[in-house]
């Protein structure tokens, strides 16, 4: 049996997270609610074979960060903190929690605006949105009284982990970037080997006013089957834990709530998903004493050159690039044993 803390319900639409007419219409069209998301998360975590504590950590403006804590009583080791990617939540680390927490504290939380954390209104300015995310991470750290941490982020979480490390370098013992989003600049269309087809450009222009996952909410009661059809690979990735649609149900309920973090992400991007403020333009300013490890899937369709670029920008600092064979973008789920082992090796270089 898992040792759980008394759970305080988090209203994912609190702190002014409304989105006008669409939000008011969603409950009657989309078969979801905060209770549905809670149940979906509990199904994701019920197969995690180790004890943990869960808590809504309070930060400013009445917001709360939904958090899981593993081996938090081990005070002799630097804690590992996991930041999920866009469209995800802490439940997607289900294949990693037990192994990673064998000898050190591990914390995972839903980013502000995602999962079961509060879903406030974000600024429309990309720099300010980034700062809001970074400050929420810092307030979370202060609330839990963590002195230093090994900060690991996947996808959007990698971008935010790097942004946090730039602003609060004294709090980061090692930065681990897993298939990070938002590092390279968007290439000029003229420089691309394969120009973007006209129909894709037209579709991108048509969808510009909408959030990236608006289609799921527009699909209403058909949204879950849409996730199952578009991403059947997620069911395969977690087949060692679940035989049913637990994972796709979790992803669905994470992404049809109030689109707070989703809107924030949209405000940080330019067409086709590139970052407005690419991290490679700034990562050279990271404190030279912070070691950086970049983990990518050898089969990923995402640009895998960021590690090499970071090395060239930090020639006198520790930067290591690690390829996980047989893994795509979701490295931690594609090859969890290999991923866990590599992360533990990195952590052991800290203490």
Curated annotation (Swiss-Prot):
A motif (HXXXXD motif) lies at residues 329-334. InterPro entries: AB_hydrolase_1, AB_hydrolase_fold. Preincubation of the enzyme for 10 minutes at temperatures above 35 degrees Celsius decreases acyltransferase activity subsequently measured at 30 degrees Celsius. Acyltransferase activity is reduced by approximately 60% following 10 minutes preincubation at47 degrees Celsius. Pfam families: Abhydrolase_1 (PF00561). Keywords: Acyltransferase, Cytoplasm, Differentiation, Fatty acid metabolism, Lipid biosynthesis, Lipid droplet, Lipid metabolism, Phospholipid biosynthesis, Phospholipid metabolism, Phosphoprotein, Transferase. SUPFAM superfamilies: alpha/beta-Hydrolases (SSF53474). Optimum pH is 7-8.5. Residues 79-184 form the AB hydrolase-1 domain. The gene is Abhd5. Acyltransferase activity is inhibited by detergents such as Triton X-100 and 3-[(3-cholamidopropyl)dimethylammonio]-1-propanesulfonate (CHAPS). Acyltransferase activity is inhibited by the presence of magnesium and calcium. It comes from the Eukaryota. One of its GO terms (molecular function) is 1-acylglycerol-3-phosphate O-acyltransferase activity. One of its GO terms (cellular component) is lipid droplet. One of its GO terms (biological process) is lipid metabolic process. It catalyses: a 1-acyl-sn-glycero-3-phosphate + an acyl-CoA = a 1,2-diacyl-sn-glycero-3-phosphate + CoA; 1-(9Z-octadecenoyl)-sn-glycero-3-phosphate + (9Z)-octadecenoyl-CoA = 1,2-di-(9Z-octadecenoyl)-sn-glycero-3-phosphate + CoA; 1-(9Z-octadecenoyl)-sn-glycero-3-phosphate + hexadecanoyl-CoA = 1-(9Z)-octadecenoyl-2-hexadecanoyl-sn-glycero-3-phosphate + CoA; 1-(9Z-octadecenoyl)-sn-glycero-3-phosphate + octadecanoyl-CoA = 1-(9Z-octadecenoyl)-2-octadecanoyl-sn-glycero-3-phosphate + CoA. The modification Phosphoserine is found at residue 124. Its main location: cytoplasm. Coenzyme A-dependent lysophosphatidic acid acyltransferase that catalyzes the transfer of an acyl group on a lysophosphatidic acid. Functions preferentially with 1-oleoyl-lysophosphatidic acid followed by 1-palmitoyl-lysophosphatidic acid, 1-stearoyl-lysophosphatidic acid and 1-arachidonoyl-lysophosphatidic acid as lipid acceptor. Functions preferentially with arachidonoyl-CoA followed by oleoyl-CoA as acyl group donors. Functions in phosphatidic acid biosynthesis. May regulate the cellular storage of triacylglycerol through activation of the phospholipase PNPLA2. The HXXXXD motif is essential for acyltransferase activity and may constitute the binding site for the phosphate moiety of the glycerol-3-phosphate. This is 1-acylglycerol-3-phosphate O-acyltransferase ABHD5. It comes from Mus musculus. Belongs to the peptidase S33 family. ABHD4/ABHD5 subfamily. Its EC number is 2.3.1.51. Highly expressed in the adipose tissue and testes. Weakly expressed in the liver, muscle, kidney, and heart. Expressed by upper epidermal layers and dermal fibroblasts in skin, hepatocytes and hypothalamus in brain (at protein level).
């Amino acid at each position: 049996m898992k040792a759980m803390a008394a759970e305080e319900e988090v209203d994912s639409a609190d702190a002014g997270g409304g989105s006008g007419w669409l939000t008011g219409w969603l409950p009657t069209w989309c078969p979801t609610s905060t209770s549905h998301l809670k149940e979906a998360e509990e199904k994701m975590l019920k197969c995690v074979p180790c004890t943990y504590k869960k808590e809504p950590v309070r930060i400013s403006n009445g917001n709360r960060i939904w958090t899981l804590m593993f081996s938090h009583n081990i005070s002799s080791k630097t804690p590992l903190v996991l930041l999920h990617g866009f469209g995800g939540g802490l439940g997607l680390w289900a294949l990693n929690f037990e192994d990673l927490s064998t000898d050190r504290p591990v914390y995972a939380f839903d980013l502000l605006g995602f999962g079961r954390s509060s879903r406030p209104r974000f600024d429309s300015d990309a720099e300010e949105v980034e700062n809001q995310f970074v400050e929420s991470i810092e307030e979370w750290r202060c609330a839990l009284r963590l002195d230093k941490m090994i900060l690991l982020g996947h996808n959007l979480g990698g971008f935010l982990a790097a942004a946090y490390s730039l602003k609060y370098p004294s709090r980061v013992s090692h930065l681990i970037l897993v298939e990070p989003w938002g590092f390279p600049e968007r290439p000029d269309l003229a420089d691309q080997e394969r120009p973007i087809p006209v129909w894709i450009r037209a579709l991108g222009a048509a969808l510009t006013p909408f959030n990236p996952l608006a289609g799921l909410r527009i699909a209403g009661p058909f949204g879950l089957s849409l996730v199952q059809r578009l991403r059947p690979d997620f069911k395969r990735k977690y087949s060692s834990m679940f035989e049913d649609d637990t994972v796709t149900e979790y992803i669905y309920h994470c992404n049809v709530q109030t689109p707070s973090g989703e809107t924030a992400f949209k405000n940080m991007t330019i067409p086709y998903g590139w970052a407005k403020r690419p991290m490679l333009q700034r990562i050279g300013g990271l404190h030279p004493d912070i070691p950086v490890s970049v983990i990518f899937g050898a089969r990923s369709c995402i640009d895998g050159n960021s590690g090499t670029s970071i090395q060239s920008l930090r020639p006198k600092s520790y930067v290591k690039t690690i390829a996980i064979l047989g893994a795509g973008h979701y490295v931690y789920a594609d090859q969890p044993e290999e991923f866990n082992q590599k992360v533990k090796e990195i952590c052991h270089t800290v203490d």
